[in-house]
A protein has these predicted regions:
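Long, non-membrane, amphipathic alpha-helices that form coiled-coils
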Residues: 154-197
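Short, structured secondary-structure elements
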Residues: 1-159
Length: 197
């Protein structure tokens, strides 16, 4: 069900597994795609669907799922061409977020308001840049990478990896606690050695 229902949303949100410029390198967005499919399968309320995609990472005690949802904001094309001016493309990425968000969530094409007030809809250039300011808080570099996703990157382990990570974290904590205090075995060995001298 979710796969058939979500394809229109994935198109509106400009989902792709590649960066979209001349090299069209691979990027890993399938976890966000799967989040959308699962949201449709669970019949997630639209307000939650919207909030989690636009600002899931800003929710108090955001879950991994809510952070994945914000992949919506990272679906824009990414240019990794040599010689680009990163700040120029960072600006383009933010403008793309504004345009895509307005189209997908509000049903408005407001790209023209980037340069002037909208000719037909009550949307001003000032309002475009107010939305721009909201979306200009993603700490990205503006220049893509040769392989993989542009930073910042959310680490999303599989369930098996999460279990293994938790096991290793507990083991590290135990070993660090052992190292933080004196080692009684060494004290006994040192005392024995001193008596032999």
């Amino acid at each position: 069900f979710g796969e058939r229902m979500s394809f229109v949303w994935l198109d509106a949100a400009r989902y792709a597994d590649t960066n979209g410029y001349q090299r069209d390198t691979v990027r890993i967005m399938w976890r966000w795609r799967d989040w959308v499919i699962e949201a449709f399968n669970q019949n997630m309320p639209y307000d939650e669907f919207t909030i989690e995609q636009l600002a899931g990472d800003l929710l108090p005690d955001a879950t991994l799922s809510q952070r994945i949802a914000t992949g919506f904001n990272r679906n824009h094309r990414i240019n990794g061409e040599g010689g680009i001016i990163p700040e120029e493309y960072a600006v383009e990425y933010v403008a793309d977020r504004v345009s895509t968000t307005s189209t997908a969530f509000m049903g408005l094409s407001i790209s023209c308001a980037r340069c002037h007030d909208h000719k037909y809809d009550p949307f001003t250039q000032k309002e475009f840049y107010e939305l721009y300011a909201y979306f200009n808080n993603v700490p990205e570099e503006g220049k893509g990478r040769e392989v993989g996703n542009d930073v910042p990157i959310a680490e999303v382990p599989t369930p098996e990896q999460a279990v293994r990570r938790d096991e290793l974290t507990a083991k590290i904590a135990s070993l660090e606690q052992q190292l933080s205090g004196p080692d009684e075995r060494l004290d006994a060995l040192q005392t024995a050695w001193e008596q032999e001298q």
